[in-house]
Amino acid sequence: MKLFNFKKLSMLIAGFTLVTSPALAEISLRFGYEAPRSDSQHSAAKKFNDLLMKKTKGEIKLKLFPDSTLGNAQTMISSVRGGTIDLEMSGSPNFTGLEPKLNVIDIPFIFKDREHVYKVLDGEVGQNLLKDLEKQGLKGLAFWDVGFRAFSNSKQTVTKPEHIKGLKVRTNQNPMYIEAFKLLGSNPVPMPLAELYTALETRAVDAQEHPIGIFWSSKLYEVQKYLSLTNHGYTPLIVVMNKAKFDSLLPALQTAIIEAAKEAGQFQRDLNVKNEQNIISKLRKQGVEVIEKINTEPFKTLIEEKVRKSFIEKHGDDLLKKVDALSE
């Protein structure tokens, strides 16, 4: 009888040890974002989770919350800083209130092409900008992709600045974009993405400017029939994590998170480039007039120099020079 009890006790202890072993404990991280499930951001988030589970042998997994389930971008960023959400991704303009130097990314026409974008974001300039978020309680993991921005409206074809004059244009809350659209003679109306469709449908605003991937996935083509590929700015996504949570993890897990985030970001960039022409074709089938080739020089003349000057007055010209130098 004593032998039986000893064996039983040994089995219970072994089972308890197996269940509570840190190596087998699963860490579940909440990851929120505004984009709907149909967007490449959601595809990349799933890829991020797959990579993370593989790299950590299942120790870390992501719980995904797309489509503004946990609030708009600003709400989610605050929640990540407060620790109620673990990770969040949204366009860089949403972070400029915390780190104003990020405004350099949003200066109109600052980027020559995607190659220029990647040199900046994946190099010293971009990595330093991510690091600057740490003093705000955020660990910047990687830059993902929203894309070059296009202009849509419900009034007319837009091929020159005067076509924008007087329109109520939804912009993000970034001061660079607000200033730029004021210089074009429009009336900028900052609002979250989650409110945009209804605002366009009810004509509370006449126009908006987003990369075409968002225009498609958010079904804005249902309420906007004129789209001009102005490429007036490029917007990256920034994937952030609560810094205290990140710091609490073992170094090997930290490395896995950063590696998985960067690899998923490259996956999403490639996916967006691949999808662009397909989206344009689908938009035309939905009755959207898409203008692909536009002379952007008149737009640049009105806004580029003045917005650059505003940035230099606040932050100096060193960062701007570094970005310009990488266009070669």
Swiss-Prot record:
Source species, domain of life: Bacteria
Secretion signal, residue range per the UniProt entry: 1-25
GO molecular function, a single term: carbohydrate binding
Family: Belongs to the bacterial solute-binding protein 7 family.
Keywords: Periplasm, Signal, Transport
Record's protein name: Uncharacterized protein HI_1028
A biological process term (GO) from this entry: transmembrane transport
GO cellular component, one term: outer membrane-bounded periplasmic space
One Pfam family from the record: DctP
Protein's organism: Haemophilus influenzae (strain ATCC 51907 / DSM 11121 / KW20 / Rd)
Subcellular location(s) of the protein: Periplasm
